[in-house]
């Protein structure tokens, strides 16, 4: 039987580099690379992408941590010294997305960039970054599901890491990682095979796809807050699914109106 993975990947004297941080930074770098490659298609200066990331990333991390702490307040109110111990894990993707979206809106308006264009080039990278980032949860043994008798369909290294508190746990991190990877692949396929994508289509797909997957997978977890019969993140998922559907509908209606005006 394999030992569990040490959350610390590398120690350099007093400095410890965690796998969690490596996963987040790796996803971020890939997201930046993709967005910079896509930016010229929308007439956006690729340098704006790096400027945006340097501003948005720390704010998104704070938002993700704040979201997590708020919904785990019963624990952190008793352990206030751990509120800032982000290296131990404990950030909520939705908190980061909300904070990041707010910064994106402000940044786009400041630089006279269409918000939907900015979102369209950001969405593919965000999705693959989320896929990679979930492996940080894997190493930290968090964001898992209910106890099960066995996980024989998985490689030994994943089975062992999902043996938590005396039981195997449903690897919800893996399900979400794969779901996001599939979504990323679909976006690439849509971009390659469908040259008629409208402004906002990629953003709508991201919101609906990610929201659906997160809603289902969140229902398998056992470590998140309940509210009116559902987990808080499931309510947020419903909200972003509706947002994506509404955006898709109104963009379609606008396209029809533009077509009638031209004819």
From Swiss-Prot:
Keyword Heme listed: no
Tell me, which GO biological process terms does this entry list? lipoprotein biosynthetic process
Give the residues annotated as coiled coil: none
Write out the entry's keywords from A to Z: Cell membrane, Membrane, Transferase, Transmembrane, Transmembrane helix
Give the Enzyme Commission number. Answer: 2.5.1.145
Q: In which pathway does it act?
A: Protein modification; lipoprotein biosynthesis (diacylglyceryl transfer)
- UniProt cross-references to InterPro entries, sorted A to Z: Lgt (IPR001640)
- Cysteines paired by S-S bonds: none
**Which spans are transmembrane here?**
15-35, 52-72, 83-103, 112-132, 170-190, 200-220, 227-247
Checking Pfam families in the record gives: LGT (PF01790)
Query: Major place of localization?
Result: membrane
Residues annotated for a 1,2-diacyl-sn-glycero-3-phospho-(1'-sn-glycerol) binding in this entry: 134
Question: Which subcellular locations apply to this protein?
Answer: Cell membrane
Report membrane topology. Multi-pass membrane protein
This protein's GO cellular component annotations are:
plasma membrane
Q: Name one GO molecular function term.
A: phosphatidylglycerol-prolipoprotein diacylglyceryl transferase activity
Function, as annotated: Catalyzes the transfer of the diacylglyceryl group from phosphatidylglycerol to the sulfhydryl group of the N-terminal cysteine of a prolipoprotein, the first step in the formation of mature lipoproteins.
Q: What is this protein called?
A: Phosphatidylglycerol--prolipoprotein diacylglyceryl transferase
Which organism's genome codes for this protein?
Streptococcus thermophilus (strain CNRZ 1066)
């Amino acid at each position: 039987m394999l030992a569990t993975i040490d959350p610390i990947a590398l120690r350099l004297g007093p400095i410890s580099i965690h796998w969690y941080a490596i996963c987040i930074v790796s996803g971020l770098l890939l997201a930046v690379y993709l967005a910079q490659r896509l930016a010229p298609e929308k007439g956006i200066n690729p340098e704006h992408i790096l400027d945006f990331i340097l501003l948005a990333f720390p704010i998104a991390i704070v938002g993700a941590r704040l979201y997590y702490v708020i919904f785990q307040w019963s624990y952190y109110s008793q352990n206030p010294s751990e509120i800032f111990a982000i290296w131990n894990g404990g950030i909520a993707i939705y908190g980061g997305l909300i904070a990041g979206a707010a910064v994106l809106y402000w940044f786009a308006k400041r630089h006279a960039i269409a918000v939907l264009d900015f979102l369209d080039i950001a969405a593919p990278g965000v999705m693959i970054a989320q896929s990679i980032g979930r492996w940080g949860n894997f190493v930290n043994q968090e964001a898992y599901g209910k106890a099960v008798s066995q996980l024989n369909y998985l490689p030994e290294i994943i089975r062992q890491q999902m043996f938590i508190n005396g039981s195997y746990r449903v690897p919800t991190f893996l399900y979400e990682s794969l779901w996001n990877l599939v979504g990323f692949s679909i976006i690439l396929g849509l971009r390659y095979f469908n040259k008629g994508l409208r402004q906002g289509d990629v953003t709508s797909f991201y919101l609906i796809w990610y929201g659906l997957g997160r809603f289902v997978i969140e229902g398998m977890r056992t470590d998140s807050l309940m509210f009116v019969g559902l987990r808080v993140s499931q309510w947020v998922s419903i909200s972003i699914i509706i947002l994506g559907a509404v955006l898709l509908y109104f963009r379609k209606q606008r396209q029809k109106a533009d077509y009638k005006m031209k004819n």
